[in-house]
A protein has these predicted regions:
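Short acidic/polar N-terminal linker immediately downstream of export determinants
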Residues: 24-37
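Short, solvent-exposed coil/turn segments at beta-strand boundaries
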Residues: 43-47, 66-68, 124-127, 164-171
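Positively charged n-region of N-terminal signal peptides that target proteins for export
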Residues: 1-6
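Boundary at the C-terminal end of the N-terminal hydrophobic targeting segment
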Residues: 19-23
Length: 219
């Protein structure tokens, strides 16, 4: 997902193949990560040569490198209550409900001062998705690369999140706009430009995912 210079790409090619650590709940097949549930597989967005790392649990996988890539993909199976909420509320209200009660609540539990910068329902993406942007004080995943702010100022990370339902699983894709904290005051993108960067990166991740068809739909 990050842009690499031609020289760096050439160096990587000369180094030969590298592998990710295999101590994970899911599995690596070629250039793809397969979730523990088998519900999806995704083209891996990081390179081990650039410090790329994969960590996961039965529900969440995280991809991160040493430069500016931080992506998490969560897949939560809907129980009977959640399926009922989804069917009675409709896609938009259900995703807002899920985001507020689970995703946002989790951020607020871990970081003080979390704010919703904006949110938008996108009916044309994944048959209805919720796109949100969060400001997370002290929530960057790249603390060692933060540009000095002076005084007691705390860097405010920005996360783009995309929520949708697929095959009775709620998916939450989350990406940090790492450049915002790495470059600090030198980062000159407007809020609208930042949102567009995150939106494109989120959609790129969706394009990397292949979902497993429900058992009844398989031939």
């Amino acid at each position: 997902m990050s842009r690499l210079s031609p020289a760096l790409l050439l160096l990587i090619a000369c180094l030969g193949p590298a592998v990710f650590a295999q101590d994970i709940a899911g599995k690596i097949e070629g250039k793809s990560y397969v979730s523990p549930t088998g519900q999806f597989h995704v083209q891996i967005p990081v390179l081990p040569e650039l410090g790329g790392d994969i960590t996961d649990t039965p529900n969440v996988v995280t991809f991160q490198d040493d430069f500016n890539v931080y992506v998490s993909i969560a897949a939560f199976q809907q129980d009977a209550t959640q399926r009922w909420e989804n069917s009675t509320r409709g896609a938009k209200d259900y995703l807002v409900y899920f985001f507020s009660n689970f995703v946002l609540a989790d951020f607020k539990q871990n970081f003080e001062g979390v704010q919703i910068e904006s949110a938008k329902f996108v009916p044309g993406t994944m048959e209805g998705s919720l796109l949100t942007y969060l400001l997370v004080p002290g929530g960057t995943m790249f603390p060692e690369r933060v540009s000095p702010l002076g005084g007691d100022a705390v860097p405010v990370a920005k996360r783009g999140n995309l929520l949708f339902v697929r095959n009775s699983f709620v998916y939450v894709i989350s990406i940090e706009l790492a450049e915002r904290v790495i470059e600090g005051k030198a980062y000159g993108k407007s809020t609208e430009e930042q949102d567009e960067i995150l939106r494109k990166r989120l959609l790129d991740m969706v394009d990397r995912i292949t979902f497993t068809a429900p058992a009844a739909a398989r031939k």
